Structures are given as C-alpha cells and as structure tokens.
Regions:
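Carbohydrate-active catalytic/glycan-binding domains of CAZyme proteins
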Residues: 1-124
Length: 124
C-alpha cells in the first residue's frame, strides 16, 4: 500500500524493462493526499534495478519487486524480493528521496540481501 507523507501518498510499483521483458525494475510516484488519482511526481528513473548478484541469481533472475515499505524516523525502508529467492531491503533518507524524485534525479538507495533461500542472514 502507499505510504502517507506530508507531501502526498508515496507509491512503489514494479514494471518490465522495454528492452528486456525478463527484467523487472521498481519505480515510485507521489499521489495527491486528497485525490490519489492525481499524480504529483513520478520518478523519471527506476529506483531499484536488478544489478546485484543476488538479484540475478535465483528462481527469477533479474527481478526486483517491493513487497513493503515503512518510514522510520527520517528514513524510508523498502523490503523487496530479489530473483524470487532472496529477501532484501533498501533504504534512503526520506527528504533526499523526495527531493531527488521531484528533481528527476537518480535516487540512490542503499541496499542489501537480508535472507536467502538457505536462511543465511546478512546485515545490510
């Protein structure tokens, strides 16, 4: 579900690459609080792409998809799946994230694998 922020509803979605239908990327958009059918901003560039080894080695190589997100203090944390085999997380400063999205800049998320199919845990 979208996250309520002071600037609007923050929504994450996944989409296929135009160049390669086997690759899934994650995008973000900000919707109006009172009228969520109105898109205020949409990230020009994907916010997550399958560029880590654990996002390209598994049941569905080249696939990342957000399964949840939460705002903790001034950080936004996205929980996502990598290659349908790994539980992953990515995070960024919320203010910087929103600023980058509004300015059509590339959004830099710090990411890492949390747990893989063998239940090995790795801190991000």
């Amino acid at each position: 579900p979208p996250l309520k922020t002071k600037e609007g509803w923050l929504l994450f979605y996944h989409a296929m690459s135009k160049d390669d239908f086997s690759k899934y990327k994650v995008g973000a958009m900000l919707l109006d609080l009172k009228d969520p059918s109105k898109v205020l901003y949409r990230a020009k560039h994907p916010i997550l792409i399958p560029d880590e080894c654990y996002e390209n080695d598994g049941y569905k190589p080249g696939v990342v998809y957000v399964s949840g997100a939460v705002i903790i203090g001034d950080e936004i944390v996205l929980h996502y799946g990598g290659a349908d085999s790994y539980v992953c997380a990515a995070h960024a400063n919320l203010e910087e994230f929103m600023k980058s999205m509004k300015q059509d800049s590339i959004i830099n998320l710090k990411k890492g694998k949390i747990k893989n199919k063998n239940n090995d845990i790795k801190k991000i």
